[in-house]
UniProtKB/Swiss-Prot annotation:
The gene is Fkbp5. GO terms for molecular function: heat shock protein binding; peptidyl-prolyl cis-trans isomerase activity; protein-macromolecule adaptor activity. Acetylation impairs ability to promote interaction between Akt/AKT1 and PHLPP1. Deacetylation by SIRT7 promotes interaction between Akt/AKT1 and PHLPP1, leading to suppress Akt/AKT1 activation. Ubiquitinated, leading to degradation in a proteasome-dependent manner. Deubiquitinated by USP49, leading to stabilization. It catalyses: [protein]-peptidylproline (omega=180) = [protein]-peptidylproline (omega=0). InterPro entries: FKBP4/5/8-like, PPIase_dom_sf, PPIase_FKBP_dom, TPR-like_helical_dom_sf, TPR_rpt. Residues 1-24, 421-456 are annotated as: Disordered. One of its GO terms (biological process) is response to bacterium. One of its GO terms (cellular component) is nucleoplasm. It comes from Mus musculus (Mouse). Residues 1-20 have a biased composition (Polar residues). Widely expressed, highest levels found in the liver, skeletal muscle, kidney and thymus. Expression is regulated during adipocyte differentiation. This is Peptidyl-prolyl cis-trans isomerase FKBP5. Residues 50-138, 165-251 form the PPIase FKBP-type domain. Part of a heteromultimeric cytoplasmic complex with HSP90AA1, HSPA1A/HSPA1B and steroid receptors. Upon ligand binding dissociates from the complex and FKBP4 takes its place. Interacts with functionally mature heterooligomeric progesterone receptor complexes along with HSP90 and TEBP. Interacts with NR3C1. Interacts with Akt/AKT1 and PHLPP1; enhancing dephosphorylation and subsequent activation of Akt/AKT1. Interacts with IFI44L; this interaction modulates the kinase activity of IKBKB and IKBKE. Interacts with IKBKB and IKBKE. Residues 440-456 have a biased composition (Basic and acidic residues).
């Protein structure tokens, strides 16, 4: 469907055809963006606001001169739809396309580069012609781990988002395997959705939503109901879920700067207890949310009285130690080490902090550091039998690791030696072949000379 020239087969400029036949797809109906479908798409689904879209395109000025082409670069162009990453005409035009569709767009300056133009290729107030092929699109990966994919059906209002602790009113519909298992309006506190049988992925997504936004969320098991599943809803362990969520309204929780020290200490006691309840119930991600609140409120709090300072330090120490335990359970060992470091910064001889950091380092195969921490535990409490066992574990694991490395390197060197021997043998064989060929050639030449002499 693409050509290198800006004219059609009969020599007609496509911009002229667009002006006559193009559909006005602007909301204002000001003919700022005209569209003609050149090839119908392969599905009925169109990309949504925020989707990552992949296109091939060719751009021309209104006189037919090509100024850009992804085909020339042999690489599709990708952008997030509706985020202002491309000219307005593209956000408008691509949102109307279906996967596999090829269309032509004619874009007036106010929907393109306006009076500024672009670099030296596009002059001021230029009307542009594009041929675009929509190759693919996919939802926004909210946390860049493929755990929560969002597709926005209706863009929200304003720029404000709920924060952790905000009270939200939402409508949600949950589906699994094509079956709707939950459909209701519900009011809850962000970070405490578990209390209302709402998976943690919804809590985390809500802090990225705006009022009246309607979106589809695809949740992986980690952000859904996890290994436990949800028998109440008939959800099996490690099931993937789909939710359609509408954020009807929300009231933000107080930010740290809006609270005085007394209020922060009061709230710290409350969320510490909530975190403990979640932890005991195996809801480690939810527990992390609660313990992190304590850190956000108190870590940078200054000008406290002696009594407030002691209370603050006690809450922070407990929060860091509990966060470390949560991260150990979640297998996020680097974060566990960081939290232990923070705890030990408050109390360098803290037995739990040293032990948990040792555990995390052992699980990261840093045997020497782990052994060092467990030895420090014994220095603090010589009766800690678990630390003694862990030291033995570190020594055994280090020995096994070194033995495994020795075998790997021995096999590696053996392979290198065998390869070198083959190369030497090959070279020697080649040399003999060359010498043999040279000898035969010399012998042949001598025979020819003998024949010549005999003939004479």
């Amino acid at each position: 469907m693409t050509t290198d020239e800006g004219t059609s087969n009969n020599g007609e400029n496509p911009a002229a055809t667009m002006t006559e036949q193009g559909e006005d797809i602007t909301t204002k109906k000001d003919r700022g963006v005209l569209k003609i479908v050149k090839r119908v798409g392969t599905s009925d689904e169109a990309p949504m606001f925020g989707d990552k879209v992949y296109v091939h395109y060719k751009g021309m000025l209104s006189d037919g001169k090509k100024f850009d082409s992804s085909h020339d670069r042999k690489k599709p162009f990708a952008f997030s739809l509706g985020q202002g990453q491309v000219i307005k005409a593209w956000d408008i035009g691509v949102s109307t396309m279906k996967k596999g569709e090829i269309c032509h767009l004619l874009c007036k300056p106010e929907y393109a580069y306006g009076s500024a133009g672009h670099l030296q290729k596009i002059p001021s107030n230029a009307t542009l012609f594009f041929e675009i092929e929509l190759l693919d699109f996919k939802g926004e990966d909210l946390f860049e781990d493929s755990g929560v994919i969002r597709r926005i059906k209706r863009k929200g209002e304003g720029y404000s988002n709920p924060n952790e602790g905000a009270t939200v009113k939402v409508h949600l519909e949950g589906c699994c395997g094509g079956r709707t298992f939950d459909c209701r309006d519900v009011v809850f506190v962000v970070g405490e959705g578990e209390d209302h049988d709402i998976p943690i992925g919804i809590d985390k997504a809500l802090v990225k939503m705006q009022r009246e936004e309607q979106c589809i969320l695809y949740l992986g098991p980690r952000y859904g109901f996890g290994e436990a599943g949800k028998p109440k809803f008939g959800i099996d362990p490690n099931a993937e879920l789909m939710y359609e969520v509408t954020l009807k309204s929300f009231e933000k929780a107080k930010e740290s700067w809006e609270m005085d020290t007394k209020e922060k200490l009061t709230q710290a006691a409350i969320v510490k207890e909530k975190g403990t309840v979640y932890f005991k119930g195996g809801k480690y991600t939810q527990a992390v949310i609660q313990y992190r609140k304590i850190v956000s409120w108190l870590e940078m709090e200054y000008g406290l009285s002696e009594k407030e300072s002691k209370a603050s330090e006690s809450f922070l120490l407990a929060a860091f130690l509990n966060l470390a335990m949560c991260y150990l359970k979640l297998r996020e060992y680097n974060k566990a080490v960081e939290c232990c470091d923070k705890a030990l910064g408050l109390d360098s001889a803290n037995e739990k902090g040293l032990y948990r950091r040792g555990e995390a380092q052992l699980l990261m195969n840093d045997f020497e550091s782990a052994k060092g921490d467990f030895e420090k535990v014994l220095a603090v409490n010589p009766q800690n039998r678990a630390a003694r066992l862990q030291i033995s574990m570190c020594q055994r694991k280090a020995k096994e690791h070194n033995e495994r490395d020795r075998r790997v390197y021995a096999n590696m060197f053996k392979k290198f030696a065998e390869r070198d021997a083959k190369e030497e043998a090959s070279k020697a064989g080649s040399k003999k072949a060359v010498e043999g060929a040279a000898g035969k050639q010399h012998e042949s030449q001598a025979m020819e000379e003998g024949k010549a002499k005999g003939h004479v």
